Amino acid sequence: MEEFQGYFELDRSRQDDFLYPLIFREYIYALAHDHGLNRSILFENAGYYNKSSSIIVKRLITRIYQQNPLIFSANDSIQNQFFGHNKNLYSQIISEGFAVIVEIPFSLRLVSSLERKQXAKSHNLRSIHXIFPFLEDKFSHLDYVSAVLIPYHIHLEIVVQTLRYWVKDASSLHLLRFFLHEYWNSLITPKKHITIFSKGNPRLFLFLYNXHICEYESIFLFLRNQSSHLRSTSSGIFFERIHFYVKIEDFVKVLFENDFQCILWFFKDPFMHYVRYQGKLILASKDTPLLMNKWKYYLVNLWQYHFYAWFQPGRIDINQLCKYSLDFLGYRLSVRLNSSVVRSQMLENSFLINNTMKKFETIVPIIPLIGSLSKANFCNTLGHPISKPTRADSSDSDIIDRFLRICRNLSHYHSGSSKKKSLYRVKYILRLSCVKTLARKHKRTVRTFLKRLGSEFLEEFLTEEEVVLSLIFHRTYSTSRRLYRGQIWYLDITSINDLVNYE
């Protein structure tokens, strides 16, 4: 047990950091506005065109501690004018500034961790597509998979306790506790039994959510790494990139401190793989379902007894990869069994050898994508293209450029699809919707307007990869078509298109 004691000890080097005085610094709110916001709520209110001062912030914090923070003095006309437009205005102001402040210990921790590990500062691992080559390489050798929705409708006090390991300033923690209890209902939005963050306060709650996720993953991945026979250094660097200002090895809090070696033996599996995305996680293993069940109940106990998040074990299904398809970041993942029969002739005897190989497939589900196009008024619910209403002063080139940008973004994101039929249909919908929009603007028929545009208009909807491959292999058309039909993963995609994010 002594050899693992270093993993359990939290870093005490920054216990004397006091973050509370930073709340009264004006540049903190300017920093939050410049880096985290598209628009400043401070400049949208009549009668207030200056930056938030320390006096304003002090008044806001004072009202948080009061029983009725919405009662203002009748003589304070400037405050009534400032606060009257949005009763949650000052909660947004403080949340924006507080989010910047509490990120400071994590950012300092990240910089020191990178300097200590001397990890390569590559941006490729931040790409969404960086996970697909990993899945393509691993999933074809695995047998069982389980997709789980991570519960994060947690108690407010658990959020504060999670930050206690990082933020040692008691005043800041007390302010956060009062702030969350007072404005919890206005900062979150219930939707289909899932709590999502309000668009007005995304930074603070994304930070709190990631801190909560990193807390449980530190325990989970620590047991996984210690019990594995194969320690991969590349996976450590990978997790540095996707985690939120944190290094996995830097803080670990294990529930089961008694008989630790038995716990490690209990979870021993060199082929257990873990992937997290969009509030969900994937567990995949090569072993029998028994080991998957062990990890399943470990996660349930961890969430229920450590984070006080209610979760039913029956909601975690364990499926065979060869019989199960998984919706993952706009793709539908599956492992298909390809069987081939080989005839072998040895002297006078012949044998038939049946070889079965697993192939990892990534398919673009067309029905959800058509639903997203329908909501954006590019087509109806059946997938028939329709004209999109446009502004009267929009030029033809602006309309065409908008459709081309959407088409190329979708094609760029779904370039890893093993079957391109869905992409061809999406291109057809966007191309014909563009023609109908232009024809509606000029009050002409679609056929007449399409003749006017000519074949050059259709060529503009070719994606970049099609154009590049056609230039490189212009003499061998079959080669370029075969390469384009293959899977292409780009390492510069850092966000999901709105039309793709249909989950």
UniProtKB/Swiss-Prot annotation:
Keyword Methyltransferase listed? The answer is: no
Q: What is the protein's major site of localization?
A: plastid
Q: What is this protein's record name?
A: Maturase K
Q: Which UniProt keywords apply?
A: Chloroplast, mRNA processing, Plastid, RNA-binding, tRNA processing
* Family of the protein in this entry: Belongs to the intron maturase 2 family. MatK subfamily.
Q: Name one GO cellular component term.
A: chloroplast
Can you provide one Gene Ontology molecular function annotated for this UniProt record? RNA binding
Which Pfam family is an annotated match for this chain, by its short name?
MatK_N
Q: Does the keyword Plastid apply?
A: yes
Tell me a GO biological process for this protein: mRNA processing
